[in-house]
């Protein structure tokens, strides 16, 4: 027996088009938030790199201002300007000399740039698909309104 392929009810088609539109809209929002987070990460990495580079010219110990939160700072003395402690992930902290720490930051910056580029491409793709879904939704909605008259 051959199956009878009846067209989908119009309200179901409209609902599917709206779901597709909503999905792409949500993905755009998520990707935008992730790009914003990556931008802040890149800024923090740049600041850390700049600070480490300035430490390279220091000798012995140095007076520094340390942020302790909520726009509050404390004066402190940096006992060792040749080595720093670097979080390498998973709660693991290792001692590195300043040039090695700078290389680590540069590698992280490249990784952030690569992820940002991939995310920007996805964002562009989602935007195009959302635009197509929106056009289809408007077109189909207008078609249904025309039938109601």
Residue ranges and their predicted role:
Residues 1-88, 92-149:
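Intrinsically disordered, low-complexity regulatory regions in eukaryotic proteins
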């Amino acid at each position: 027996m051959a199956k009878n392929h009846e067209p989908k009810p119009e309200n179901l088609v409209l609902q599917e088009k709206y779901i597709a539109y909503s999905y792409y809209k949500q993905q755009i929002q998520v990707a935008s938030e992730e790009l914003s987070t990556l931008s802040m990460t890149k800024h923090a990495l740049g600041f850390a790199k700049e600070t480490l580079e300035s430490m390279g010219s220091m000798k012995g110990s140095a007076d520094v201002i340390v942020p302790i939160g909520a726009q509050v700072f404390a004066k402190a003395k940096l006992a060792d300007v040749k080595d720093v402690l670097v979080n390498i992930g998973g709660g693991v902290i290792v001692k590195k000399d300043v040039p090695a720490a700078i290389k680590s930051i540069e590698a992280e910056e490249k990784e952030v740039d690569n992820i940002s580029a991939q995310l920007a491409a996805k964002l562009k793709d989602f935007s195009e698909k959302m635009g197509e879904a929106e056009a289809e939704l408007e077109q189909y909605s207008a078609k249904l309104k025309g039938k109601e008259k």
